[in-house]
Each structure stands twice: as structure tokens, then as C-alpha cells.
């Protein structure tokens, strides 16, 4: 969705705006092609500049035109995945012709705060994890409330459960999506059929993508503000409910 939204003038130097121009002939998609030749993104990126004032739903339907043939040819259940982490825009939420399910992926508060406060620790800031802790609490509580009200099936998935117990977690997720689990899912980069133009650079790292990997650096650290904050029952309950309960509805 972020790539489809009309870029603001102040963001003309950023990826979404640049991909409407020459960058689409340089940046590679995870399918292996440069963006301009990607069977999914290529036609859309060429079409967008003259249609950027169209509603987001129209743009999404244009994008899905390039995905639909692969989905129908597979002969099994297929899902189009939109995974921009800060995105709560669902233009098709009320479209009766589409089945929409939500996977709510949440990272343990201690791991998230440790990662977000890294720069503050290097600069010697006092309590560098305090602001990230408040942000995790605010965002996670808000997202849980929004998803409880969205009226769609929601699968609660903990980042730690996925990374530390990948096969068990993926089998449970596949069952929920009516998909058959395949061992190849445990090697995400090598077996991916995705079309991703922006995001974590590890998506192109074949070695690191050969398995699902978890950075457990935070576990070796001493007591942090996030670890101490888990002594507060409401925060501990939210972290447990979103990350470790394996709850779905």
C-alpha cells in the first residue's frame, strides 16, 4: 500500500516516488527481475504516474491484476499478502467478493525496546529504552483494539514464536489459512515467490535467508527498563496475549 499511495512533494527523494521514475529500471524485486520487468510491479509502476490521483482501491485492483493469474493456476488456496508493518488501511475491508484475514505479528516488548534503544545506548542517553517502551505499549494496545473491531478473522502471531519455533508455528498458521505446510517454508529467501520492492535488505541475502533466524542479543543483557516494566501486570498481560498466547479468532 505504501508504494501505491501518491507521494507527497517533500518525499520526492524517497523510494515510492523514485520507483515511478528511473529507479524502477535499477531496483530489483525479490522475484529476481528489476522492478520495471517484474510481472506484478512493472505494469503498475508504469501506470501509476498518470493515475496517482485515483483512489487507493483502484490502484490495488490494478496491482492484483498481475497476481490473479498465478493464484488461479495453482489449483490450491492462495492468498495475496500485504505486509507493510505500519499500515492499517484496508480499502477492501467491506468488499464481499474478497475473503480477508489478518495476521497480527508482534515482537516481544523486551526485544523491540532493546532494538529501538540501541542508538540511545551508544550515545549514553539516560534510560534510552523508556520512550521506545511507551511507544510499544501505545502501538500494541491500539492495534489490538483496532483488530478486535475489524470484524475479520485475526491470527495472533508472536515474532519470538515464529523465529524460535518456526515449524510448529508455521504448521499452525498453514492450518488456519487452509494451506499445506511445506518444508521449503523454513528457508524463506530460497523458496520465496514474493514480489517485494522495499524493506529489509536481508530479503536478498541467500545465506541469512536459508533459515529463519532470531537475534537473541537482548537475552544476554542485564535488566532493562522493558524487563522491569513487565512487573506491571497490564503490560505483562498484553505482551503475553499478543506474543505468546498463540490466540486466534
Predicted features along the sequence, with ranges:
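Short, compositionally biased low-complexity segments
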Residues: 30-39, 110-113, 202-211
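Alpha-helix initiation/capping motif
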Residues: 49, 53, 129-132, 220
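PAPS-dependent sulfotransferase catalytic domain
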Residues: 56-73, 88-90, 96-186
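PAPS-dependent sulfotransferases, especially Golgi type II membrane carbohydrate sulfotransferases
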Residues: 58, 68, 72, 117-120, ...
